[in-house]
Each structure stands twice: as C-alpha cells, then as structure tokens.
Amino acid sequence: MNYRNKKLLELARELPCQQCGREDGTVVAAHSNQQRDGKGTGIKAHDFRIASLCFTCHTDIDQGSTLTKDQRREMWEWAHRKTMGEFFLRDLISIR
C-alpha cells in the first residue's frame, strides 16, 4: 500500500514551480514515475515522492518528446530535492 497524505499534496501547491519558478496557479504535486517509488500500472508513487511543478514542466517531464528518459528523470529528481528542501526551509513540514 502506497503512502497517501492529502496535506502534503496541498503543500506542494504553495510553492513556485521547482523547475522554472513559475507561480501561475498551475503548480501541483507531480509524482515520481519510477517503480522504485511505488509507481505501478494505474498506481501513483508514494505521496512523499513528489515535486512542485507547473503544468508545462510537469507535462515536459511526464511526456516530453524533446527530452530523453534520463533527462526527464534527472529533472524530476532535481525538482523533488528542491521541493523537499523548500518544505523544511519554509517551515511547512517539521520533524516532531
């Protein structure tokens, strides 16, 4: 069973796009497409494996034909690390 947390997904919308910096109202929690992160056929990855991405960057990473699979994976991983860092730096999440 994959980890689900609606509040974490909502927090992702509070950040600018972690790929391009846009704050255009289209930023969402973009889940990893990697099987190692819990992704399966018809199943999203764990909610802790998300990146705050705008519609354009999310589409480029999920379906971009101008990028290789490795480039898309690297872009998502970079945005994921930035997202997690911003959550802590902005005190949006903390360790109890």
Regions found by a protein language model. Give the residues of each.
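Short cysteine-rich loop/turn motifs with clustered Cys
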Residues: 2-30
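Cys/His-coordinated zinc-binding microdomains
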Residues: 21, 55-58
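Short recognition patches in nucleic-acid-associated and regulatory proteins
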Residues: 25-41
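Polybasic, low-complexity binding patches
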Residues: 38-48, 59-96
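Active-site cofactor/substrate anionic-group-binding motifs, chiefly glycine-
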Residues: 51
